[in-house]
């Protein structure tokens, strides 16, 4: 019944969006490109490149999980009107309930013409769990080098759709990627100084594989990806037994997940939760971590601090 209601809501909202489209051109009265991103991280990267040259709508709200989402009528309307749509790809919005696949199909949008995966060119890491083996791990942005790649892919499509602002986009891209690159180099140096027997990042979801590869910090987790069961007794037991064989000084919990399973791990191992960190979303505006750059800086700083205890 819930699924039927969701489909009906999507259909009605799409009709409303198409009717709204018929009242004007897709670029709107402002003449600016209408751009849609699937989540707050992609929205922030896009804003850093496009500035005020576009009208931007981000679908999944700040703090919400982009793996499985039910688009609202406004999301359907904005998607149907969009000149350009950016999504992460590699099993994020297209895994789980495949909400993005349904959304663009119903909006009659065409891949690599209307919507683009910003992860194109990423060296993909694959999941390993019993029910997930062989599927792509979507969390590529947690390696800053991939964040730079995302920015370049976004700029490429903005320029293709809006060539008159090419110089503006390229200038912003250069400044932004230089900023990200400096943070990346700083992080690589910081993690070199942590003793090997303390060097492990422990989180609820196993979303730090790209981070681990980039910064040389092994990872452990309760569950592998948010589209599977989360925080079962067996998952918790497995992690607790693993941690008892280590000298890991700190645990971390993501801002967009239920923290109760990690609290159980902390209690059973006597290892404290050092900080909340960001994975699938930036923070609310005005809070620490409210941009891609600041969320990554927060993560890198807090993880290095916690593992240095």
Swiss-Prot record:
This is Metal ABC transporter substrate-binding lipoprotein FimA. One of its GO terms (biological process) is cell adhesion. A lipid is attached at residue 21 (N-palmitoyl cysteine). Part of an ATP-binding cassette (ABC) transport system involved in metal import. Binds a metal with high affinity and specificity and delivers it to the membrane permease for translocation into the cytoplasm. Also acts as an adhesin which is involved on adherence to extracellular matrix. It is an important factor in pathogenesis and infection. May contribute to the formation and accumulation of dental plaque. It is found in: Cell membrane. A lipid is attached at residue 21 (S-diacylglycerol cysteine). The keyword Membrane applies. GO terms for cellular component: plasma membrane. Keywords: Cell membrane, Lipoprotein, Manganese, Membrane, Metal-binding, Palmitate, Signal, Transport. Residues 1-20 form the signal peptide. InterPro entries: AdhesinB, Bact_metal-bind_prot9, Lipoprotein_PsaA-like, ZnuA-like. It comes from Streptococcus parasanguinis. It is a lipid-anchor. A divalent metal cation binds at residues 67, 139, 205, 280. Pfam families: ZnuA (PF01297). It comes from the Bacteria. PANTHER family: HIGH-AFFINITY ZINC UPTAKE SYSTEM PROTEIN ZNUA-RELATED, METAL-BINDING PROTEIN HI_0362-RELATED. The gene is fimA. Its main location: membrane. Belongs to the bacterial solute-binding protein 9 family. Lipoprotein receptor antigen (Lrai) subfamily.
């Amino acid at each position: 019944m819930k699924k039927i209601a969701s489909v009906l809501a999507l259909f009605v909202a799409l009709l409303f969006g198409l009717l709204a489209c018929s009242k004007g051109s897709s670029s709107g009265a402002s003449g600016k490109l209408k751009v849609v991103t699937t989540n707050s991280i992609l929205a922030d990267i896009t804003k850093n490149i496009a500035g005020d040259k576009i009208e931007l709508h981000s679908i999944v709200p700040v703090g919400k999980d982009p793996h499985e989402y039910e688009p609202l009528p406004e999301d359907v309307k904005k998607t149907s009107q969009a000149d350009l749509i950016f999504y992460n790809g590699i099993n994020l919005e297209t895994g789980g309930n495949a909400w993005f696949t349904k959304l663009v199909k119903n909006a009659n949008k065409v891949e690599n013409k209307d919507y683009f995966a910003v992860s194109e060119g990423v060296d993909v890491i694959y999941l390993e769990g019993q029910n997930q083996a062989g599927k792509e791990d979507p969390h590529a942005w947690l390696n800053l080098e991939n964040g730079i790649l995302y920015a370049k892919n976004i700029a490429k499509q903005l320029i293709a759709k809006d060539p008159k602002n090419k110089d503006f986009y390229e200038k912003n891209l250069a400044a932004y990627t230089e900023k990200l690159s400096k943070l990346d180099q700083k992080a690589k140096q910081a993690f070199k100084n942590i003793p090997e027997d303390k060097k492990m990042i422990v989180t609820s979801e196993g979303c730090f594989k790209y981070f681990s590869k980039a910064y040389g910090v092994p990872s452990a987790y309760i569950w592998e990806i948010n589209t599977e069961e989360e925080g079962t007794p067996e998952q918790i037991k497995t992690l607790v037994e693993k941690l008892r064989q280590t000298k890991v000084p700190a645990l971390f919990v993501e801002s967009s997940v239920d923290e109760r399973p990690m609290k159980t791990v902390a209690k059973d191992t006597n290892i404290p939760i050092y900080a909340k960190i960001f994975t699938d979303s930036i923070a609310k505006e005005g809070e620490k971590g409210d941009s891609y750059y600041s969320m990554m800086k927060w993560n890198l700083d807090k993880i290095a601090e916690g593992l240095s205890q």
